[in-house]
Amino acid sequence: FISAGQKQMNQLDSTASAEGNTEGLDFVDAESRVDLLENKVVLCVPEGSDKGIDSFDSLAEHLKAEDILFCMGNSDVPVGQYTQKILAYYDLDEAALAAAGVITYGSNVKEVTTQISEASVDAGVVYCTDAYSAGLTPVDEATKEMCGQVIYPAAVMKNALHAEAAKEFLAYLRTDKAATVFESVGFTAL
């Protein structure tokens, strides 16, 4: 299992804190758990946009002015959670912006990239890798201070039908050969 966030892995890992694993689930082979990749949270705008959004700072100004339509992931998906941290960093009230009709949501990062690509919104926050896949050019990259790091943990599940093969595959994903592929699409191998 590879997750785009520690929270989702922690929910399945009995060795995670009680705060992280609120239901006491025990699906992760803790000895196999590794931090595999890092992704970046980026700001993208539609090609040819004339709104002047070229940084997270300018995005925050436009959101405060309520003069754009911004897309972010729902709060139950990792990219949405990282975006919420960015909004908090700029002291922006997500609920108030949503009520004002300034925010639209995607149920996953693909929906956010689609809204940006189709110019249905003026800006959106996605992962660097998803921007790459969708042919979008990021205009800014969130700092660690804005939203923390986007670390992709990986682990073999205790109920894996082919646990040894899963462990071998996870070991392969940590090789230089795999790192080259990951880095070619925007990830940083850890």
Predicted regions and their residues:
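Exported/periplasmic ABC-transporter solute-binding proteins
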Residues: 3-21, 25, 32-39, 45-190
